[in-house]
Amino acid sequence: MPKEEDFQLPRRREAAKNVNYNEMEIDTKLVQQIQIAEKSGAKTKGSNSQTPRNCKRTSNPASRNEKFKYQKFLHDKNTCWNFIPTLPPSFRKNSRFSNILDLDDAMIDLKKMSLFNTESVLLSANDTIYMISEPAGEPYYVGRVVNFVSKPEFSNTIHEAIKTTSVFPAKFFQVRMNWFYRPRDIQEHVNTFNPRLVYASLHQDICPISSYRGKCSIFHKDEVFDVLPNEKECIIRPNIFYFDELFDRYTLKYYKVYSTDKILNKWNSKSPFLYVLNRRFRYIYTEPKYPLENVLKKYVFHELEVNELSPADYQWDKRCQFCKEWCIQKESLSCDECGVCAHLYCMDPPLDRKPNKDVVWTCFSCLQKQQGTKDSHVRFLEEQALELDFIRSVRQKIEEISSKAIKENVGYNTENCWFQYLGIYSISHIGDALNDSMFFPYPFKPSRVGVKYQWNGCNHNVPWRRNSYISANSEEERGSTKTSELAWVLDASKITTRKLSEYIEQCKSEICPILNVRGETCNFIDVVLKNLLFTNYDTAEAFKKCKRELSRKFLKEPSFTAVEIRKFEEAVEKFGSELRPVCEYVGTQPMSMIVRFYYNWKKTERGLTVRGKLSKLSKNKRKKEIANHENDVETKYIDDSSFDTEKLSLAESSFQCMFCKTDYSPMWYRVTGGSDDEKIKIRMQTGVNEKTEISEKSPAHSKKNEKLGALCIRCARMWRRYAIKWVPPLETLRKITGTCQNSFYSAIEGIIEENNTNKFTLSPFQAHNKLLEWELVQDSELIIRQRMKVYKNPNSFVKMKRYSMTFHTQLYKMAVRSYRKNEFHPETMQRDLELFIEDNKEVRKAIPEQKPERAKNTKDEFPVNIIRQSPGTIKTSDTSRNRKCNDVFIEKASNNNIPKITNASNDLIEISIKTGGSSSGSVSVDKGFKFVKFDNKTFQRLRNSLKLVNNKLPKYNEPSTKKIKMINDIALSNPLNEPNGASYNYTVISHSKETSVALEKYHDGNKPSKMLEKDMILKHTKNKPKNPDTAWANNSARTFCSVCKEKFNDNDNYEVVCGNCGLTVHYFCYAIKLPKDMKKNTNLKTFKWLCDPCSNDLNPIISTTYQCSMCPTKDYDYDRYRSQSFKICPDALKCTSLGTWVHLVCSLFNEDIKYGNGQSMQPALNTTAVLIKHSRFTCGVCRINGGGLVKCNKCQYRYHITCAQNSSNFKLMFEKKNMSVDTTLPCIKDVKLNDTYTLRPILICDRHDISLEGNELYPLSYKPQHTLSYIEQYCRYYKCESDHSLVELRYFEQLRLRHGEMPGNSHDSAIKPKIYVLPFERTCPHCGTNKSLYWYEDIICHSCNLRSGAQELDFDSASANISNDNGLPVEITQQLMEGIEPAMFDIDISEAGTDKNTHPSSQ
C-alpha cells in the first residue's frame, strides 16, 4: 500500500477562472444555442460540441423527432413516386392543352383578319398560339398569327370575289405564322435553360389552320408588367413567355430588341421620328453593343444643340470619319487621342490588316493639333465645323422625312411585321425605316472584303475560248438525222396495225415466258419493234431474230439469286425506300439493277408483305366493298400528336411513359424516339413477343411484355408547352432547397402538413432562379402531398388511377371530328367555293335597304324587357348580340305610348314613359343595354301589374307565395316595330324549374295564327338561318317532315313551318297544340309558329346550345337543305330534364327515355342513364361510341336513330300487334274500330328486308282519320310518366343514377293491365258537324236525326253509349270519385219530371 505521504493535494491552477459546475444551467444554455443555430440555418454537429467532458451531450428531442418524422414515408418502396396527381379544381382549367379548333362553321374575315364562328372569334391577327410541330412528338411551335392566306388553288377565285365580300369559309385558307424560337431550337444541346424564355425571329411559314393547339401569351420583357400585375404572376401563370432578343437564322447572330412604345415614352415623347416609327413597327432590333439611345440623341433628337456636344459624346461614336459608316473593331482603327474611328480600307493608303497591339494610331486632326501652328489650328477648326454641319444635316433630313410621313398619315406596315432592323449597318439610312414603300426587316450585312474572303486561283488565267459545239470529226450538228438512230416508225404501206398487233402478241406469248419478263417491259417492246424495223417489217424474220438474240442480260433486266433477294428484302425492311443503303447492303448488284428490281417488286404480294402494306390494302378493299352501306359522313381522328387509343385493345396495358415510366394515362401522346404507328400496328397484329414474318425483331435480352414508348398526359403537357422533361419530385425539391438537408426536410414537412389543396408552399422565385418550370414544381408538390395519402391508405391509389382514366372519353371526343366524304377533295372544294360566291352575290342583290319606321302602340304596355337574375344585375332578353344605342332619339306622338329616348349624359340613356299624355315614370339604361335602373314609380307599377298577371296563371306544383323569376312584357330588342309586323306575346312565367312548363306557357300565349312571309324570320334569335337569303320563297319545295322524314301529302293539312329557322314538321309529330277548328278552316303552313329552340331564344330559360345529347348528328348544312340536294334540315329538338336538348326521334325510339308530359313529348327523362348504358357500344354507321343507340329489330347491331335516318335502306316504323281482350300487357283500344293492340317503334337496318310475321308495320307519320296519330298514341300511353310530378321524376332519376340502376317499365301490367281507350271525333255525314248531344248509329248528329225522324232517343242505349264514350279506365274513375258521397248523385226522375221549375216545357 502506498504511504500517506505519497498523497498530495492537487496543484493550484495558474490562472484561476470562475467555472460553473452546475450541469442544469449548462444544459439550458446548450439548448438555447442549438435552437439559435437551427433558426439561422447553421449546421450543428455533436462531434464539435464545446461542452465539457463530464457534461452529457443533450439535444432537443422534439426538434429531432420533427426532422425525421417522415423518414419512413421517404424510404417506403411500396408506394411509387411517378403517379399522375389529381389537380385541384382551381388548376384544372389551365391544365388543358392540345386544343383543336372546330372549323365546321368557321369563317374568315379578310378585312379584320379574324377567324370566327357563330359564337365567338377564334383567332385574330397578332394572336400568339401553339402550333403542332413536325414531327408531332416534339414540343409545340410557338408563333404569332401574321395573317390568313388563301390556298394557292383558290387564290385567283377568292381575289376576284373580294370585290363583293370579304368573308369566306375557313377551309379555303391557311395561316401565316411568325415563329418564336426556344433555346433548344437554336442550340442542339442545352442542359439548363429558362423554359419561359423565347427568341423572336423573322422566320415565317404558311401552315394549315388545323395545326392550332392552343393560345399563349408572349411579351417583351419591358412590357410584361403592363399586362401582369407583378413578377410572381409572370412565373406562376401558365402559357406565359417573354423575350428580349431576336435570333436571325441567316446571320446566326443574336440582336437586342427594343419596344418602340417604350422608347417613345422614355427617351423622347416629342420626337416625330419615334412617333412615326412607333406607328410603323412594334419593335426594332439592333446589335447587342450598339448604343442606339446615344445615336438617336446625337443624330435624331433636337433636345441638345450641336454646339453643346461634349467630348464624351464622341467616345462611343464608332462612325468612320471618311465614309460615315459604323466601324467594327477588327476592321478599323481608333485614334488614341480623340477616339475617332476609321476603316482600314478607307485610309490613304489602305491597310491590309491591323497593326500590332503595341502600335498606337493617331488621326490627322490630332496630329495637326499637336503641331500647334496657326494653320494647323485653322484646319482643325474647319474639320470640326464640317463635323457639326454633318450632324445638323442628318437631323434636318430625318425631321423632314418624319414630317412628311406624318402628313401622309403613314400607318402600320401592310406586311404586319413586328420587327425592323435599326442597327450598325443602317446608321446612314435611319430615315428609310419611315418610308412606306420600303420594307427591309432583315438585318444588314456588309460585303465581305479581304484576303480571307477572296479567291486566289485567278492569278494564272488562260484566255477563255469558247468550245465549239460541233466536233471536228462531225459534219452535222448533234440532234440531226445523221447523229441519231431511228428506233421505230410505222409504215402503213408495209404493215397493217392488225399484223403489228399479232406480231407483238406472238413475241409476248412465246418469248416472255422463256425469259421470265413481263410483256409490258419498256426494253422488251423497244427491241421487238426495232428488230421489226431492221427486217423491213418482215414479222417472221423479226420474230426469229428476237428469239435468237433476246436474253435478260440483253434487255438489262435485273436477275437476282435467292441469296440476293433475301438480302434485298432484309435491307428494304431496314432502310425502307432509301435504295442507296439497300444497294450497299446487297453488295453484288449495281444501283441501276436495284432500282429496276425494286419498282417491279414493291407492288407484288411479297413486296407489300415486307413493306407492311398488305394489311392496309386489304383494309381499304373491305372499305370499298361496304361503301354502299356507309353514310355520307365519316369520322376521323384529327390529333396527330396523340394516339387513337380507341382502336388499340392493348392501350391500357401496352404503353409506358418514356419520361416518368408510368403505365396509365387517359390519353397517350407521341414523342420523338417513341413508338410510331407501324410499330403499334405490328404489336396489335402479332401480340407482345410473338414471332412472325412481319413482326419486329426483339433483341436477345428483351424483357417480357415490353412496353410501347409514349408520353402520359402530365409529361406531354410540360413537354409540349415548355420543352421540359419530367423530373422526380425529390430531385426537383433538392434543386430548390440546395444542399442543406434541414431545408429539404423542412420543405417536405411544409408540403405534407399544408391543408389547403389550392395552396403551394414552395417559392416561385426560388424555382425561377433555379430555372425550374413552376408547373413541374406544382406537380412535384402535389405528388408528395398525395403520396402521403396513398402511403396511409394504399387502396386510394386505385381510386386515383380510376379517376384519372375517367377523362378518356372527354379527351377522345375532342380529337374526333365528323366530315363529309370528299369534303376536302380539290374539285369538291372548288365547287363549294363557287356556290358560296354565287349565293353571296344573290343575297346582296336580294336584300333591300331597310328603313326603320316608327311602330304604333296603342296599348298601355311597358317597353322594357326584364330578366331578374340577381338583386344587382338586370339584363335584356336579347341574347344574340350586344346592342348599342348611341345618339338614338325616338319622338313620341301625341297620344301614343311610345318611349321617348334622350341622351341624359354620356353614360346613361333616359327613357321617359308617358301614359295618357302625363309622365308615368322613367327608366335609365346604359349604352350597351347591360344595366337598367327604374325610378320608384315605374318599379311599383311593374310590381303591381306582375302580381295581377301572376294570380291569373295556373299553379304548377308551386305555391303562389314564391318570388317571380322572370318577367317578359314586351321585347326591348325591337323598339322600332314595323307596321303589320309579327308580334309575339311574352308570357310572365312564375318561379318554376320545369322547362317544359315554361315552353308550354309560351306556346299557350302564342298559338299559331296567320302571318305574312316577310315576318317569318325573327331578327334577334340565336337559332338563325345560316344563309342570310330568306329561304321561305321556296316553301313548296320542302317536302318532308324533320321528325319522321316522311313526305308531306298535299291532300292533308298537317304541315307546320317554324317562322324563324324553317323547321317543317307534321303538327302531331312535334306535339303542337292547335286551336279548335283551325285545321279545318285554314292552311297551317301560312300561320306563325316557333319551335322550342327558337322560343327559347326569345327568352332563354335553358341551354342555348342546340345540339342533341344522344347522337353526334349536327345541323351543318342549311344551304344544301334549301337546295334539296340532301335530306338535311333543321333539328327537331325537345328539352330534357337536365336543361339540354335531344332530337324528338332519338328520345322516341329509346325505350328507356320517358316524357314528363306525354302530350307535349317533353321533357325527356333518364338521358344520362341511357348514355351510361350505351357507352360501351358502337354505332354501326358513324362508328362512334355511346349515345342513344337503338338495336335493330332483326339483329344485334346498334345505331343512332339520326344516323339510320340519314342512311339508305334503313326502315323506321311502328309495329302494331293485335291483342286479345284478356291480355296482361298495356294496350290501346280503338272503340270505333273495335280494335285492341300494342304499339312500339322499331328500327330495321339495311341488312334485312321487311317481313310482317303476323304484325302490321306503319310509317311514323301514320294517322287514322278519326283519332290520334300513332306517334301521339305511343308518346301518351307508353312514354309518359304521368303518375308523378316533374320534381319527383327528376329525384327518382338522380336516385337511380346514384345506385347505378336503369329506369324500368312504369307499367305494372302483370297486376293491373291497363287499357287505354282512344278518343275519336265523329263527323255527321249530312251536315259535317262534330258536335252533338247524342250520336245516332255513331255517325248521325241529333239535329239531322230530328229532321229525318229516323230514330227516337233511347235513354238506356244513350246512357250506355255515353259511358262507352267516356273512355276512362276503371281505376281513374274510382280515384275521381274519392271523397264524394254517392247519395248526392241519387236523383228521383219522377220528381224531376213533375217539377215545373225544372221541366223544359214549362219555360
From Swiss-Prot:
InterPro entries per UniProt: BAH_dom (IPR001025), BAH_sf (IPR043151), EPHD (IPR034732), Homeodomain-like_sf (IPR009057), SANT/Myb (IPR001005), SANT_dom (IPR017884), Snt2 (IPR029617), Znf_FYVE_PHD (IPR011011)
Residue spans, zinc finger RING-type: 1041-1095
One GO-annotated biological process of the protein: histone catabolic process
Molecular functions (GO terms): chromatin binding; ubiquitin protein ligase activity; ubiquitin-protein transferase activity; zinc ion binding
ZnF bounds (PHD-type): 317-369, 1038-1097, 1177-1231
Domain of life per record: Eukaryota
Catalytic activity: S-ubiquitinyl-[E2 ubiquitin-conjugating enzyme]-L-cysteine + [acceptor protein]-L-lysine = [E2 ubiquitin-conjugating enzyme]-L-cysteine + N(6)-ubiquitinyl-[acceptor protein]-L-lysine
TM region(s), chain numbering: none
Record-given protein name: E3 ubiquitin-protein ligase SNT2
Gene field: SNT2
